[in-house]
């Protein structure tokens, strides 16, 4: 092994030319021909037209449904304002470091979610496969929420919302309009067994839910059409890559903020809103002694920041090499958390109003997840004047929040596949056909969640396939790979070459110690405190249902150890020799900025090397492995 192979830190010009020639199948033609081939390859892969497109695309991906329906609920559940303490701790120690790691890695390598890890450390290429498996699961089930929201939106264009009153064909005798409750009118109904019209609309009209996963039942064709509409919109948002995605996000990433602002203003002007906000923020410091509060804060960071999915790597790979991704990441992380915090005011002001109107404690109306989006909030708007208008705005906001998160996930998966096989998919309309194929396959797989028993399958996907446990597992290996194997100092050199300065040392130590330690602790807590999933805390799945859930969870997590085992098995030599070969970055992974263009001395993982301006190494000290 040569010194140049052991520590590839040069400017990478020759490597870029070689890669461009290889991508296009070229082999000769001299320097001019090679340069032309390289330029053509870069053009074919695409770049963002400007920084705004990148920022809006990332904002659209990370600012999604979880900001509206999960963070406010967790805040009130875990001590109100006191919950912000563990949230900020995880924000600094886990959120920003991993978010920045993935974005910077994509920008430095200009590769998708799999090939970036292959070039940095072949032994840990399984990280890329794990992220794409999680992403594939997400692509199938996340868009189901959009189908539900589209169905609700289609029912908003009436003078009276269909879930506001009883008397429809889907309502039962137990249906009671609580906000207009008159005991003489419901003498035949036991109030303990009564249900609301909004609940019956959700369970009987939308889901037509069966009594268990064992009874899948019929396909809900109306929802199937809504899902088809969602996938059609998603396809045309990304079918031209960054050319189309970069334009669409100007609408999809900004429109939800307009809707959120309108709903916030409306919410805080309602009677009872102040009590709802107080309930949301009132600090209960005693809750900080509960480990579950800290676990909830950590998992919320991972869920809402879209880390460990490969999305940030893919989006960052379309940046210009010298883009200041460090500043972008800090700004986007603050924007994401700020949006979650403000959304809590919009949600809990309305829940406070609903509790005020019904004369019940706010705890009885507070919901999380689909329960908030499709039961609690729709119920609240029925009590407002011009309720169809507010319902329309709310579901439009949900659709746009989910839409850009969905199509960015699909785009990231496509980017990973195309970068693995550039000669195959960067020709003609093959990339567009790949997106079409993935969309069609995901659509038909998703239909099973639109059956009468589909909600039970949806919950399995949500609780296992893309669970916090899977994300934490991937995050541990990402930090180990960059912090220890590739080397945090080396990666800081790469970042300095891109942005012109070195980030705070705190982030480097988070990669090496803090973040993997915290993630490992929460992961173990998950395993120790594991409780089998129950739908609505009532329905218990059969054993084979839990088996399917764990298979989906393991399908991503096992990618990493299996890949390590396979690579070690196939590589020749003793174990130390195998590790040495498999932990060396790709020889053409060069720095392309000012640092890579000038001679200098660099120290990476206790190795000191004299690097010439052409990217070769004139002298190198002992190269140690971290294994």
From Swiss-Prot:
<feature type="transmembrane region" description="Helical; Name=9">
    <location>
        <begin position="433"/>
        <end position="451"/>
    </location>
</feature>
<feature type="compositionally biased region" description="Gly residues">
    <location>
        <begin position="23"/>
        <end position="32"/>
    </location>
</feature>
<keyword id="KW-1003">Cell membrane</keyword>
<feature type="region of interest" description="Disordered">
    <location>
        <begin position="1"/>
        <end position="36"/>
    </location>
</feature>
<dbReference type="GO" id="GO:0045202">
    <property type="term" value="C:synapse"/>
</dbReference>
<dbReference type="GO" id="GO:0009410">
    <property type="term" value="P:response to xenobiotic stimulus"/>
</dbReference>
<dbReference type="GO" id="GO:0005283">
    <property type="term" value="F:amino acid:sodium symporter activity"/>
</dbReference>
<keyword id="KW-0813">Transport</keyword>
<feature type="topological domain" description="Extracellular">
    <location>
        <begin position="147"/>
        <end position="220"/>
    </location>
</feature>
<feature type="transmembrane region" description="Helical; Name=2">
    <location>
        <begin position="82"/>
        <end position="101"/>
    </location>
</feature>
<feature type="transmembrane region" description="Helical; Name=8">
    <location>
        <begin position="384"/>
        <end position="403"/>
    </location>
</feature>
<feature type="modified residue" description="Phosphoserine">
    <location>
        <position position="21"/>
    </location>
</feature>
<dbReference type="InterPro" id="IPR002982">
    <property type="entry name" value="Na/ntran_symport_GABA_GAT3"/>
</dbReference>
<dbReference type="GO" id="GO:0042734">
    <property type="term" value="C:presynaptic membrane"/>
</dbReference>
<feature type="topological domain" description="Cytoplasmic">
    <location>
        <begin position="567"/>
        <end position="627"/>
    </location>
</feature>
<feature type="transmembrane region" description="Helical; Name=6">
    <location>
        <begin position="301"/>
        <end position="318"/>
    </location>
</feature>
<feature type="transmembrane region" description="Helical; Name=12">
    <location>
        <begin position="548"/>
        <end position="566"/>
    </location>
</feature>
<feature type="glycosylation site" description="N-linked (GlcNAc...) asparagine">
    <location>
        <position position="182"/>
    </location>
</feature>
<comment type="similarity">
    <text>Belongs to the sodium:neurotransmitter symporter (SNF) (TC 2.A.22) family. SLC6A11 subfamily.</text>
</comment>
<comment type="function">
    <text>Mediates sodium- and chloride-dependent transport of gamma-aminobutyric acid (GABA). Can also mediate transport of beta-alanine and to a lower extent that of taurine and hypotaurine.</text>
</comment>
<keyword id="KW-0769">Symport</keyword>
<feature type="transmembrane region" description="Helical; Name=1">
    <location>
        <begin position="54"/>
        <end position="74"/>
    </location>
</feature>
<dbReference type="InterPro" id="IPR000175">
    <property type="entry name" value="Na/ntran_symport"/>
</dbReference>
<feature type="glycosylation site" description="N-linked (GlcNAc...) asparagine">
    <location>
        <position position="193"/>
    </location>
</feature>
<protein>
    <recommendedName>
        <fullName>Sodium- and chloride-dependent GABA transporter 3</fullName>
    </recommendedName>
</protein>
<dbReference type="GO" id="GO:0098982">
    <property type="term" value="C:GABA-ergic synapse"/>
</dbReference>
<feature type="transmembrane region" description="Helical; Name=5">
    <location>
        <begin position="248"/>
        <end position="265"/>
    </location>
</feature>
<dbReference type="GO" id="GO:0042995">
    <property type="term" value="C:cell projection"/>
</dbReference>
<keyword id="KW-1133">Transmembrane helix</keyword>
<dbReference type="GO" id="GO:0005332">
    <property type="term" value="F:gamma-aminobutyric acid:sodium:chloride symporter activity"/>
</dbReference>
<feature type="transmembrane region" description="Helical; Name=11">
    <location>
        <begin position="509"/>
        <end position="528"/>
    </location>
</feature>
<keyword id="KW-0472">Membrane</keyword>
<keyword id="KW-0532">Neurotransmitter transport</keyword>
<feature type="transmembrane region" description="Helical; Name=7">
    <location>
        <begin position="330"/>
        <end position="351"/>
    </location>
</feature>
<keyword id="KW-0325">Glycoprotein</keyword>
<dbReference type="InterPro" id="IPR037272">
    <property type="entry name" value="SNS_sf"/>
</dbReference>
<feature type="transmembrane region" description="Helical; Name=3">
    <location>
        <begin position="126"/>
        <end position="146"/>
    </location>
</feature>
<keyword id="KW-0812">Transmembrane</keyword>
<feature type="topological domain" description="Cytoplasmic">
    <location>
        <begin position="1"/>
        <end position="53"/>
    </location>
</feature>
<dbReference type="GO" id="GO:0016597">
    <property type="term" value="F:amino acid binding"/>
</dbReference>
<dbReference type="Pfam" id="PF00209">
    <property type="entry name" value="SNF"/>
</dbReference>
<feature type="transmembrane region" description="Helical; Name=4">
    <location>
        <begin position="221"/>
        <end position="239"/>
    </location>
</feature>
């Amino acid at each position: 092994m040569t010194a140049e192979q052991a520590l590839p830190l040069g400017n990478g010009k020759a490597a870029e030319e070689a890669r461009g020639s290889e991508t296009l199948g070229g082999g000769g033609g001299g320097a001019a021909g090679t340069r032309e081939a390289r330029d053509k390859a870069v053009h074919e892969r695409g770049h963002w037209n400007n920084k705004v497109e990148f920022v809006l695309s990332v904002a659209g991906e990370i600012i999604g449904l979880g900001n509206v329906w999960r963070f406010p609920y967790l805040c009130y559940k875990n001590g109100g304002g006191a919950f912000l303490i563990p949230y900020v701790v995880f924000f600094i120690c886990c959120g920003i470091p991993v978010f920045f790691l993935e974005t910077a890695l994509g920008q430095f390598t200009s590769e998708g979610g799999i090939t970036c890890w292959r070039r940095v450390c072949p032994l840990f290429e399984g990280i890329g496969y794990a992220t794409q498996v999680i992403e594939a699961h997400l692509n199938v089930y996340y868009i189901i929420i959009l189908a539900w929201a589209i169905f609700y939106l289609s029912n908003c264009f009436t003078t009276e919302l269909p879930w506001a009153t009883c008397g429809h064909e889907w309502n039962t005798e137990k249906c009671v309009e609580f906000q207009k409750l008159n005991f003489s009118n419901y003498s035949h109904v036991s109030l303990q067994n009564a249900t609301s019209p909004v609940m019956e609309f959700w369970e009987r009209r939308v889901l037509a839910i069966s009594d268990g996963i064992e009874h899948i039942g019929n396909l809900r064709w109306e929802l199937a059409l809504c899902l088809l509409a969602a996938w059609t919109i998603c396809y045309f948002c990304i079918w031209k890559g960054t050319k189309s995605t970069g334009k669409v996000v100007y609408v999809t990433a900004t429109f939800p903020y307009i809707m959120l602002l309108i709903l916030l203003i409306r919410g805080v002007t309602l009677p009872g809103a102040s009590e709802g906000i107080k309930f949301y923020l009132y600090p209960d410091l005693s809750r900080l002694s509960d480990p579950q509060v800290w676990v909830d804060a950590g998992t919320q960071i991972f869920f809402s920041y879209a880390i460990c999915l490969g999305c940030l790597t893919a989006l960052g790979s379309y940046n210009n090499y010298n883009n200041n991704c460090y500043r972008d990441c800090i700004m986007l992380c603050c924007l994401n958390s700020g949006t979650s915090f403000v959304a809590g005011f919009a949600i809990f002001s309305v829940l406070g109003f609903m509790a005020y109107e019904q004369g019940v404690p706010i705890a009885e109306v507070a919901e999380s997840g689909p329960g908030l989006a499709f039961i609690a909030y729709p119920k609240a708007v029925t009590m407002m004047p011009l309720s169809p208008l507010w319902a329309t705005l709310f579901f439009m906001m949900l659709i746009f929040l989910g839409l850009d998160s969905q199509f960015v996930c699909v785009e990231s998966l496509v980017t990973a596949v195309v970068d693995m096989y550039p000669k195959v998919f960067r020709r003609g309309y093959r990339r567009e056909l790949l997106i079409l194929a993935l969309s069609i396959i995901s659509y038909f797989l998703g239909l099973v969640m639109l059956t009468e028993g589909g909600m039970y399958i949806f919950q399995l996907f949500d609780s296992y396939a893309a669970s916090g446990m899977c994300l934490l597992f991937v995050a541990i290996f990402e930090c180990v790979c960059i912090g220890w194997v590739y080397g945090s100092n080396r990666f800081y050199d790469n970042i300095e070459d891109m942005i012109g300065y070195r980030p705070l040392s705190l982030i480097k130590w988070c990669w090496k110690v803090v973040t993997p330690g915290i993630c490992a602790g929460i992961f173990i807590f998950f395993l120790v405190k594991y409780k089998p999933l129950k739908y609505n805390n009532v329905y218990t799945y059969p054993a084979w249902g839990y088996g399917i859930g764990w298979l989906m969870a393991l399908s991503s997590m096992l990618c990493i150890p299996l890949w390590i085992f396979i690579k070690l098995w196939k590589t020749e030599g003793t174990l130390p020799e195998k590790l040495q070969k498999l932990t060396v970055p790709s020889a053409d992974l060069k720095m392309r900025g000012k640092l890579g263009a000038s001679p200098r001395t660099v120290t990476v993982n206790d190795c000191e090397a004299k690097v010439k301006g052409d990217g070769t190494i004139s002298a190198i000290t002992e190269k140690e492995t971290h294994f």
